Amino acid sequence: MAKSTFMYWQKRFNRENPDKDMEEKILELRSVHKDYGYRRIHAELCNQGHSINKKKVQRIIQKLKIQVTSFTRKSRKYNSYQGTIGVIAPNRIKRRFHTSIPHQKITTDTTEFKYYEVDERGNRTLHKLYLDSFMDMFNNEILSYNITKHPSVKNILDVLDRTIKITSDCIYRRTFHSDQGWAYQLKEYSSRLKDGQIFQSMSRKGTCLDNSIMENFFSLLKQEVYYGRIFYSYEELKTEIERFIKYYNEDRIKEKLGWMSPVQYRMNYSISSDII
């Protein structure tokens, strides 16, 4: 081997990794945001004041072997439809899942999770947990939710009342969207909306795409905290769901929100409105 070639490679091996600090920063971000791909990590770095090319972030992620690998499985979707037992509202939203006005368009749905309880003899019994949540289409923020062991009218009306109160500052007439689940058809539910001068909107029967914005949130939630794991208590599963919702609202950035989290986007909108 020529001496010049030997010296070249020796210098390369002895040279300190110029990307060491950035690699450590990216590893730190991935430890907090486990579902972030290179685009979100690049946006987060830019939000923190770092100047780096998106392709370089992608190369570092590939080098560190920390590409996102989401665990998914097919599971039967929770179906609360029990036929026509009340009034079916028209589909006012019609898949227009966006508004520039906070608290104007709200959507809701219920999903279920499974967990086990083990008795003294080691026998496992399967149980279910239900999440009722309301989302603001303005910034995809989860405004309120209930986590319960059984679906009930009281639970859904409780979280509905909280959402109506939270969104009462909207100066325009509000629209609350849902599927045709049994609870949303009840007179008690529709009466509360009518009393608040709120339009009621419903998806068409068996058309989950009419509420895909909420379906996407449930899918993300389950990929992050549920699929691939087994829970052995109600409290353990409930705590994980609450942790994710807080993280989703306050920290998880979205491209459609200008790489801000739902709460950051809302606060930024509020500041801009005050200035105007």
Protein language model features and the residues they cover:
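Generic alpha-helical secondary structure signal
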Residues: 1-5, 155, 159, 188, ...
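Mobile-element integrase/transposase regions
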Residues: 51-63, 67-133, 157-159, 166, ...
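Short small-residue beta-strand/loop micro-motif enriched in glycine and branched aliphatics
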Residues: 8, 139-145, 200-203, 227-228
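Electropositive, glycine- and tryptophan-enriched low-complexity nucleic-acid-binding patches
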Residues: 136-146, 162-165, 169
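Mobile genetic element proteins and their domesticated derivatives, centered on retroelements
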Residues: 6, 26, 41, 57, ...
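C-terminal domain-tail junction helix/linker
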Residues: 194, 220-276
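Basic, flexible linker segments flanking DNA-binding modules
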Residues: 3-101, 207, 262-270
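RNase H-like two-metal-ion nuclease catalytic core shared by retroviral integrases
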Residues: 80, 84, 178-180, 186-187, ...
